[in-house]
Amino acid sequence: MAYSYTEKKRIRKDFGKLPQVMDVPYLLAIQLDSYFDFLQQDRAIEERLDVGLHAAFKSVFPIESFSGNAALEYVSYRFGTPAFDVKECQLRGVTYSAPLRVKVRLIIYDKDSSTKAIKDIKEQEVYMGEIPLMTENGTFVVNGTERVIVSQLHRSPGVFFDHDKGKSHSSGKLLYSARIIPYRGSWLDFEFDPKDNVYVRIDRRRKLPATVLLRALGMSAEEILETFFDTSTFHIEKSGFSVELVPSRLRGETATFDIKDGEGNLIVEEGRRITQKHIRQMEKAGLERLDVPMEYLFGKTLAKDQVDPNTGELVCECNTEITPELLEKIGQAGITTLETLYTNDLDTGPFVSDTLKIDTTHSQLEALVEIYRMMRPGEPPTKEAAETLFHNLFFTEDRYDLSGVGRMKFNRRLRREGDTGSGVLDNQDILDVMRELINIRNGFGEVDDIDHLGNRRIRCVGEMAENQFRVGLVRVERAVKERLSMAESEGLMPQDLINAKPVAAAVKEFFGSSQLSQFMDQNNPLSEVTHKRRVSALGPGGLTRERAGFEVRDVHATHYGRLCPIETLEGPNIGLINSLATYSHTNSYGFLETPYRKVVDRQVTDEVVHLSAIEEGDFIIAQASATVDESNKLTDDLVQVRHKGETTFMAPDKVTLMDVSPRQVVSVAAALIPFLEHDDANRALMGSNMQRQAVPTLKAEKPLVGTGMERFVARDSGVCAVARRGGVIDSVDAKRIVVRINEDEIIGGEAGVDIYNLTKYVRSNQNTCMNQRPIVRPGDVVARGDILADGPSVDMGDLALGQNMRMAFMPWNGYNFEDSILISERVVEEDRFTSIHIQELTCVSRDTKLGAEEISSDIPNVGEAALGKLDDAGIVYIGAEVGAGDILVGKVTPKGETQLTPEEKLLRAIFGEKASDVKDTSLRAPTGMKGTVIDVQVFTRDGVEKDSRALSIEQSQLDEVRKDLQETYRIAEEATFERLKRALIGQPVNGGPKLKKGDTLDEAYLDELPRSQWFKLRMQDESLNELLAQADEQLENRRKEMDERFEDKKRKLTQGDDLAPGVLKIVKVYLAVKRRIQSGDKMAGRHGNKGVISSIMPIEDMPFDDNGEPVDVVLNPLGVPSRMNVGQILETHLGMAANGLGVKIDRMLRDARQQQVAEIRDFLGQVYNTAETRQEDIDSLSDDEIITLAKNLRSGVPVATPVFDGAKEHEIKHLLTLADLPDSGQMTLYDGRTGDAFDRQVTVGYMYMLKLNHLVDDKMHARSTGSYSLVTQQPLGGKAQFGGQRFGEMEVWALEAYGAAYTLQEMLTVKSDDVEGRTKMYKNIVDGDHSMQAGMPESFNVLVKEIRSLGIDIELEG
């Protein structure tokens, strides 16, 4: 087994029993693939698929002028290079985007020609705005901040049949409906009312009888009836009436007369129900016609118009009910055959016939006018307008599009052949939908389940961006059409016709302010990954949380392997915002697919198929944990399977598919919870959500008990530096890693060096600190995909959100009441949960009406001490320690001219006029903040002179760039000469400095030869001469490239910044704040066990064991039983064993080296290779690697217990025994204060604890004086507004109950909204007089005004 660089250093013991059939896929693929398809940037123009931008252009172009004499065609598009890279965009606060240039062709036709001959063709590239680019980690940088576009789960286009569940009508009758939902265009609904008439609605407007729509399609009443009904044929003869018999139609009816066969034998007696047996007798007797009494025809409905055969006169219309009078009339007219509609109450209702009777329209025109009136009430209809409107609704591609997925769903639901077809509707589509609806009402067929994932699809970022782009293009199209008519006469070029602003505005609006474009959650790597894999049912075209019912939010059987049943938000959005399951991805139609292994005749194969919820229904699917023998055959007599949404047991030979992995059910965050199978789902939900809120600690520590998913999240999150190609580490420092590439991975003409510049102390969106630390050393060999540097919350390539803490589950003096957590002082001393938070503070200098604001250290009325940390430019030094109220950037603002007294005038005349006409508006550190300045950025408007600080920052950045480029060149040069040296040594030469023909080159000569002279060597081997020439050219090109890059960077740095109007200068100060853990901070485990720290106890007071080892954290045992998250107990036991093994290895490491290696190798074999678990190849490691591994295991042997395939109880006990610990997992603890043993043994072990981003420093806040509400004059609320604590109604009752009248008066007046009283009080306090005089609260005045506004006069007396 080959181990990666990091795996070799610290192997995680895996308790998984099931084989790893399929690796965890790339977790961000859903974002990157979707946006790649949208841009198709790297695809050749001729290979571009009909999706994304290409499809948007093709759907809008060609644009023809109104006259048809000119047209604008789309040819192709390309992207320019972005003006700034990602880091520069974040720094400058601009969007990371590339210019889109579209090649269009203007064709002008000859007006006079009858064949539309082409008169002129002009082709030109047109700029169509900036398109935001996705970073390699699946995010967008919009206005300097990283954002994520969340995928949307919406109703798939197609046709859906449903009923109202009996809620609409008091009788509880089910009213069936059908809805055709297009991707773009008007919705079409058919619905039954309680009287069983069929109605149609367009875009949920007023309903019309459905036959109005059919008439508008050009159908007559006869055609409508013929389409929806079978007919019965009656013959009128002199002897009486007879009907052409279809025996099966009589089944279930009651005979109203005797039915006899041809020989007069009685088959069915009058009054008897006709059964299947009777029908067989009729068929046997060969009855074709049946004589019926006249009364049998009464009440039947005519299927055709009845015309007098002699005169051609209409006797009666179709859909007329037969009465004795009508029958007589028909008889007189000499009509011999009648066709009536076949209906019955059981399974062939007269719905369309009844609807026709209430339909007031009689012709196509009337129907079109009726539809026009419904769509455009109040507008006078004309024939043309009505026809155009109706045609545009469903039958033109510009206004209506079912899309490929909609047509596929439509055809499959109506059981048609083929999945493709037109994007617009036709008559047959509408008739088929009505027919299916009527069949469902008649009891044939089922309604659809809208929550089935076969009826909901994912709209990813690329698709949403395409739709938005198309919206912009359609706006452009209107303007272009108007200008095209002038194109010929004025000789315009394509550039003059197209205004790109609407497109740019539409795209900008989507990325900047769409509900689904969200500020990225960047607390830790997991929160980034989860945010990108999130699926929301909210957003444009989706649900609203107010309207979403319980069914939409609930877990559905089809979520299995597609959406996580556990991870969703708590609160009003529960169930509406979900997370993708681990192995889930979307197919070309946008439906979620999950992988399965094929099973053939009990044999489980390694062939993997990906199925959507629609395709999965017909298969019988076993779980991944189904028992198989050595040859991968299912062994059980009955296997637990899923089939059509139900879980059941079946014989193994019926099984067709099997799950790929037990973790395929859950999302990434839930798959990180060990022993998830032992936790209640509600607590697991909290656990997976709280992992996303964990703050990266100063030193990340891998979890002792993990699930094996940790390295996949770290790998795909993008926070680590990952080797792009394999090679040897050349040099490493804190900021840069240089890798010399393997020969076989070098692409021709390259230097063979990869340089990784690391992220150092950068602020994340959540103000946490992003920092990368190298984990490689010079000389290490790395392969492609190996982790070179850990990011925040990553430890040696493993996700590490928290710290392993020594736990005890016991009550301790009430300090762990109600989920409170008691921790030891040692945790604070060792900085286990210390985190760094970076605050960005901004000072903006504007151009005001009274003059420009100035950033300077010359600030009026401020002492020297306050200016001590500022430089000459008035900006704080890097490294300065600042506290609340300290000046960070000195700024003065011009003040309005005030009337001066003669004395002031005299002073101004003597001392100059600077001091009094400016006021101090400096940027100060906010209250409650204390930290160190780690960076300062100065942005200056183009044309404004840069200050000394801006120039020094610019110079230091240029020096950094120069150093970087020189280093790159040096390494490239060395690598090139190293390659040349290897090729040249021992080779004969034709000539060269101090060489004769035939000499062979040796190492000593080459070492002495100046490098500039190497290229003068002439070798006998011509290929070596080519190699030398090639190397010389490459180095020259590289030198030029470096110069160009430096000049480019210099130009970017020295040019002015593009700032908002009126802004002259922006100074950004970055403060690093160190937050130690303290009382009031929120902590949690991974099982939903959260709590607030109640107290931090001295180490000596904490409970300790027989070895004198104190515990770090004391948790309340009552937090476990009612919450049903037993996983935390199992984690604690297994963590104890893992730590115990580490202690044992530590003891071994202290022995002599020789015995040590053998003993450690043997012990590691015992630890890793137990009978049932996955085997690790310890023998493949060298002695040095074994020692390195053992050293890394000192703090504990990390274990993986995959979800639903984790460690069993006996395995945990085995490890505890191996670590020489009691297998009960409990031990005697002693009270640290008294030294007495506690009454009973206590569960002690190691649990992984997280510090959540709910820190008491961010919440704690106290107001002295501050701003007041405008109307009520009461203090504002909340920390952001520097508000007060609300003294509400109930608090008033409390003071009333205590009888504390004066305290209550103070609260309601001077401390709240008595304006005069509080001003007076302030003055009194300043003067040292602590008395108060309460006045009238302002809110009382507001109340009086409110009452007066209602017309009630209210006055105050006295």
UniProtKB/Swiss-Prot annotation:
One term under GO cellular component: DNA-directed RNA polymerase complex
Entry-linked PROSITE patterns: RNA_POL_BETA
Key words of the record: DNA-directed RNA polymerase, Nucleotidyltransferase, Transcription, Transferase
EC number(s) reported in the record: 2.7.7.6
Protein name per its UniProtKB record: DNA-directed RNA polymerase subunit beta
Annotated GO MF terms: DNA binding; DNA-directed RNA polymerase activity; ribonucleoside binding
Source domain of life: Bacteria
Gene Ontology biological-process annotations: DNA-templated transcription
Reaction(s) the record says it catalyses: RNA(n) + a ribonucleoside 5'-triphosphate = RNA(n+1) + diphosphate
Subunit structure: The RNAP catalytic core consists of 2 alpha, 1 beta, 1 beta' and 1 omega subunit. When a sigma factor is associated with the core the holoenzyme is formed, which can initiate transcription.
Function statement: DNA-dependent RNA polymerase catalyzes the transcription of DNA into RNA using the four ribonucleoside triphosphates as substrates.
Family, similarity comment: Belongs to the RNA polymerase beta chain family.
